[in-house]
Amino acid sequence: MTASVSSPSENITIDFSLEKNGIPTYSVMQQGTAVIQPSSLGFEFQNQPELTGGLEVTGTDTNSENETWEMPWGEQRNVRNRYNELVVHLQEKEAPNRMLDIYFRAYDDGVAFRYHFPEQEGIDTLIITDEKSQFSLTGDHTCWWQPGDWDIYEHLYNTSSFTGIDATTKRDHPDLNSSYIPENAVNTPITMRTADGLHLSFHEAALIDYAGMTLRIDPENMRMESVLVGSDRLGYKVKRGLPFSSPWRTIQISEDAPGLIESKLIVNLNEPNRLGDISWFTPMKYVGIWWEMHLGISTWDMEGTQDMSTFTTDQVTGSKHGATTENAKRYIDFAAENGIKGLLVEGWNTGWDHWIGFEDREGVFDFITPYSDYDLEEVVRYGR
């Protein structure tokens, strides 16, 4: 079974296919040229058998949208949201006959797809151990990438061919304290340029109540596969009650690099503003109790052990807690005298003593309990 959907200008087409063994796949064409080769889709679960095949199509729907909405905050006031959509309804041929819907949207500046698990008998919660979304490339493209670090987005970008990507070489960075790169994967967005000059960017949108996505690099098969950021403490990636939808998996497509920046694909796929009136949002400068920890003047923790020298050897520990009530007031005075509207404070809450250099640091912060030398209410009162 096959089905297709094209963008409004018909320059981009998504083709859906169900292989003989019931594996859902998709491919993408731009101006009649392949951009994404047939790529499979599916899931692995902790509380259910994997859902990667044995499916049949029970129906399809098509939709179109052409609207203009006002961006509450950003670089462009009015944004056009124009796409064609294909919804494929799937169900297992055999028990437990689980149902899965896949939504495909074709825009003039790219494509997106997401999964939807409808309400169904016998399943109220799904515990996802991994998502098996593949992106099969058409060549050894030039790539701009960051390693798939589960903790941070603080690495520099690298430029290489796709087959030249090796994120594991970025492990144990001497200047990054909380870094975890479990395999050869990249954080999104990863941006590519094909031999013909076509520019691609792979990312996600509407990331709500779901694990973030990295992309495993498979140079032998010229393919990427989604790897959800996990938790050793929990032992799974996502736990959701039905019905629910995954984030959108996005591919922005442009003839040149500026077109990727001009693309509004991501914001069109994100949820509309839920806050209502945001006219009170105003830009501001702020100062922070933060950089002094990097300079070794003070520490994040009250115990006096956690500053930049905790994982570098060319500095002397400050051993003096930075986020104290007294220091915060000093920063507030400086900000007020210089017309600076905000103050950022790091290290005010308990848990920092078990952060840098600890493999079991997950969950050490409750983001509620202050250290005894930081009076949160007094700092707020003084700032007002």
What would you call each of these model-derived segments?
Residues S4-G276:
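N-terminal accessory beta-strand-rich subdomains and adjacent acidic, glycine-rich linkers
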Residues R80, Y103, L242, S279, ...:
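Catalytic cores of large soluble enzymes that bind and process phosphate-bearing ligands
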Residues Y115, D256-P258, E292-L295, N349-W352:
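Solvent-exposed loop/turn segments at secondary-structure junctions
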Residues W144, F202, G288-W290, W300:
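Tryptophan-centered motif/residue detector
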Residues S246-P247, T282-M284:
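Short coil/turn connectors at secondary-structure junctions
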Residues A257-G276, W280, T325, K329-I332, ...:
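Carboxylate/His-rich catalytic cores and anion/metal-binding grooves
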Residues Y286-G288, G296-R384:
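Substrate-binding cleft of carbohydrate-active enzyme catalytic domains
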